[in-house]
A protein has these predicted regions:
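N-terminal secretory signal peptides and thylakoid transit peptides that target proteins
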Residues: 1-19
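C-terminal segment of N-terminal export signals and the immediately downstream linker at the start
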Residues: 20-45
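N-terminal substrate-binding region of glycoside hydrolase catalytic domains
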Residues: 36-91, 96, 103, 110-123, ...
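Short, acidic/polar
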Residues: 49-61, 139-145, 215-226, 303-306
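Conserved, mostly hydrophobic/aromatic
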Residues: 67, 97, 156, 237, ...
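Substrate-binding cleft and catalytic face of glycoside hydrolase catalytic domains
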Residues: 68-71, 92-178, 182-208, 285
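Aromatic-rich peripheral "rim/lid" segments of glycoside hydrolase catalytic domains that contact
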Residues: 148, 157, 162-178, 253-268, ...
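Glycoside hydrolase catalytic-domain groove-lining segments
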Residues: 182-187, 196, 200, 217, ...
Length: 372
């Protein structure tokens, strides 16, 4: 339904259904079941563009312990204008997940990038007191969305991609111009804590373990340190894990990896008392050979090495793929392969058959230390 803010808040009582006492029991041979045996939650993104596929829904219900709406909780989906909220798409996914005993993550209360903000925000008249109006818009949005879903969402990506990965500087948006990017981030987290006091609050970004991502890693550490120093309620870092995506045209395959620097980064993050989540795992296979058997083997090996490292940290208790089947990957529309072949970035192929990447994820879970 499309609703005003008042009616959106009024609908909270109807949504306040209890979370399942325990997640739906997964078969011991499913990814969700193998992960659960080690104290880890496994899940995937689910969006309306693939939600209508009953076979894909069934795959998610079978393999996953939780799902995250792909775009349906973002500003562009929930806010057609400054006065209106539209939760129809997000409600369908959350309702389905609850009926199937699955947990839900929320993504994202603020995508701090001008490119991904709705046009109406960029064109909004902030009036004679732009600072107050920017704060009102942001607070109203976070409070309404987080408050609506807090009964059934136990982890929110509060702020997503606030940093320019090339410069290391905080991005500027229509909301941050009147009050500053640091204030915007603080307001988002503090409002989320008020609206969802029991939820895990996450800063989510795409810094990675490649040697040419040092600027991004350093900037993320600086941001997290500043948030902790100001007492901003951030609980965890979401590591997107789009492996190979940023520099996928490199002739060096999936890139020069700097495991030592990555471990140093993760040590510093966890040293702040923050948990880790793998939030958007996939592997961009553009630089890999066309031969499917070899390509799948390379993707699987890369995935296994990455997850072994991430899961060596007991603070990593959630692993999410950004999709389960190649048919619906966002990477299909991102930098086509030079040979024109379909990409194979996910654990199941376009026909939803398991691939070596699925086996690699299962093996990484099985080998992971048990979480306390």
């Amino acid at each position: 339904m499309t609703m005003t803010r008042r009616s959106a808040l009024g609908g909270l009582a109807a949504l306040a259904l209890p979370l399942p006492a325990t997640a739906a029991v997964k078969g011991s041979d499913t990814l969700g079941g193998i992960a659960a045996a080690r104290g880890i939650r496994f899940g995937s993104t689910l969006g309306l563009r693939n939600f209508e596929d009953p076979a894909y829904r069934a795959l998610n219900a079978r393999e996953c312990a939780l799902v995250v709406p792909e775009t349906e909780m973002k500003w562009g989906a929930t806010r057609p204008d400054a006065r209106t909220f539209d939760f129809r798409a997000a409600d369908r996914i959350v309702d389905w997940a609850t009926r199937n005993g699955l947990g839900v993550r929320g993504h994202t209360l603020l995508w701090h990038s001008e490119r991904w903000m709705p046009d109406w925000v960029k064109q909004h008249d902030f009036g004679s007191n732009p600072r107050a109006e920017a704060e009102r818009l942001l607070t109203d949005h976070v409070r309404t969305v987080a408050g609506r879903y807090a009964p059934r969402v136990d982890s929110f990506d509060v702020v997503n991609e606030a940093i320019d990965s090339d410069t290391g500087l905080l991005r500027e948006t229509a909301l941050s111009k009147p009050i500053g990017a640091e204030a915007v981030i603080d307001i988002a987290f503090r409002t989320a804590r008020d609206a969802a006091p029991r939820a895990q609050l996450v800063y989510n970004d795409y810094m990675g373990w490649r040697s040419d991502e040092a600027v991004h890693r350093t900037a993320v550490l600086k941001l997290l340190e500043a948030l902790k120093k100001r007492g901003t309620p951030v609980d965890a870092l979401g590591v997107q894990s789009h492996l190979g995506s940023k520099y996928s045209d490199s002739p060096t395959g999936l890139g020069s990896l700097d495991e030592r620097a990555w471990r140093t980064f993760l040590d510093e993050v966890t040293g702040m008392g923050l948990d880790l989540l793998v939030t958007e795992l996939d592997v961009h296979d553009n630089p890999l050979p066309g031969d499917i058997r070899r390509r799948d083997a390379d993707v699987a090996a890369h995935t296994r090495a990455y997850l072994d490292l991430m899961l060596s940290y007991p603070q990593t208790k959630t692993v999410m793929c950004w999709g389960l089947g190649d048919r619906y990957s966002w990477l299909n529309g991102f930098r086509p392969r030079a040979d024109g072949l379909p990409k194979r970035p996910l654990p199941f192929d376009a026909a939803l058959r398991p691939k070596p990447m699925r086996d690699a994820i299962a093996a990484a879970f099985a080998a992971a230390p048990v979480r306390g």
